[in-house]
């Protein structure tokens, strides 16, 4: 039987909502662990301890650790996609992405660094990359040649991924403003020869 404290945690929460809330708590704990710069062991027990939930609740949402790690990565990627989709200009996109992935670096480390240390995410990272490229392609929709459009989008996603990874690893020595300005200029300079300036925002 659950303790009074544990029962109190869900007091007033409809039964149908409790599973979703517990899953959200577990995902949030997974982001913190997977994105920690100290790289603690991401075990089911560690996740449950971080989320203050028992393992029984873990297994009501996830079949095993691998499924959970993929779900954590998918959650961060989805947040990143949603953030970029709502941006109207290159500067807004970069600023929003920095707020999401650098100001809260655990998310950035999950997105950019975790696939290199979690074998289960190798495939997930490869599967998500085309989504980011396609999103950028849509932002460059006025480019007439779809092949050229895709090459530009692919080169920008690759270049920006490398920049954000280096920034998260504190390898650039750039201030936040310098970093944002450089990323914005990179977007403009790469696309400018092919897109009329009004289309660049």
Language model: regions and residue ranges:
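Short, hydrophobic secondary-structure boundary micro-motifs
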Residues: 43, 109-112, 175-176, 199
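Secondary-structure edge/capping motif, primarily at the C-terminal ends of alpha-helices
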Residues: 83-87, 111-115, 140, 167-171
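An amphipathic alpha-helix adjacent to DNA-recognition modules
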Residues: 20-31, 35, 40-44, 49-52, ...
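Amphipathic alpha-helical packing segments from all-alpha helical-bundle domains
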Residues: 119-161, 177, 185-188
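Amphipathic alpha-helical segments that line or abut small-molecule/effector binding pockets
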Residues: 28, 88-106, 150, 154, ...
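Amphipathic alpha-helical segments used for helix-helix packing
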Residues: 100-126, 133, 137, 165
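Basic/polar phosphate-binding segments, predominantly the helix-turn-helix DNA-binding elements
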Residues: 5-17, 47-68, 103, 108
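C-terminal peripheral helix-coil segments that are non-catalytic and often amphipathic
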Residues: 1-7, 138, 169-201
């Amino acid at each position: 039987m659950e303790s009074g404290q544990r029962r109190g945690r869900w007091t007033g929460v409809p039964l149908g909502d409790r599973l979703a809330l517990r899953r959200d708590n577990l995902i949030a704990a997974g982001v913190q662990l997977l994105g920690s710069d100290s790289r603690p062991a991401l075990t089911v027990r560690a996740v449950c301890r971080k989320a203050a939930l028992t393992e029984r609740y873990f297994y009501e949402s996830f079949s095993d650790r691998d499924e959970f790690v993929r779900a954590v990565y998918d959650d961060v990627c989805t947040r990143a996609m949603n953030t970029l989709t709502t941006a109207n200009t290159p500067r807004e996109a970069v600023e929003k992405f920095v707020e999401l992935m650098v100001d809260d670096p655990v998310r950035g480390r999950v997105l950019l660094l975790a696939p290199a240390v979690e074998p289960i995410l190798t495939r997930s990272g490869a599967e998500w990359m085309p989504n980011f490229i396609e999103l950028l392609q849509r932002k460059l929709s006025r480019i007439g040649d779809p092949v050229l459009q895709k090459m530009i989008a692919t080169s920008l996603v690759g270049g920006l991924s490398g920049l954000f990874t280096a920034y998260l690893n504190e390898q650039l020595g750039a201030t936040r403003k310098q970093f944002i300005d450089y990323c914005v200029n990179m977007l403009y300079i790469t696309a400018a020869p092919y897109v009329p300036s009004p289309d660049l925002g």
